[in-house]
Amino acid sequence: MTEQKQQKKWHEKRKHLVGVVVSDKMDKTVVVKVDRKVPHPIYGKHIIKSKKYHAHDEHNECRVGDIVMIRETRPLSKTKRWVVVKILQRARRPEEEIQKQQEGQEQ
């Protein structure tokens, strides 16, 4: 039976997290803040706890405010153990908003 089961590939077994890019100042590295809701141990109220992860961004595509999915990987440096898998949602940029306003005024 175990032979008949499909084996998951190693990269499918790794953890995936979704978070917001808070810093992109380093080359090929972004800092991603991941929020999670945790119940208070005594009172039971859900509290939002956040943690920051350094993630590898090979092509420097991520910008501050982007919502990204990151995947656990082998250690790439002292603090980097995550890789950006994909950008789920781009953050709006002031330049983009100005261009949209100018296009709207021209019409």
Curated annotation (Swiss-Prot):
The keyword RNA-binding applies. InterPro entries: NA-bd_OB-fold, Ribosomal_uS17, Ribosomal_uS17_bact/chlr, Ribosomal_uS17_CS. One of its GO terms (molecular function) is rRNA binding. SUPFAM superfamilies: Nucleic acid-binding proteins. The keyword Coiled coil does not apply. One of the primary rRNA binding proteins, it binds specifically to the 5'-end of 16S ribosomal RNA. This is Small ribosomal subunit protein uS17. It comes from Aquifex aeolicus (strain VF5).
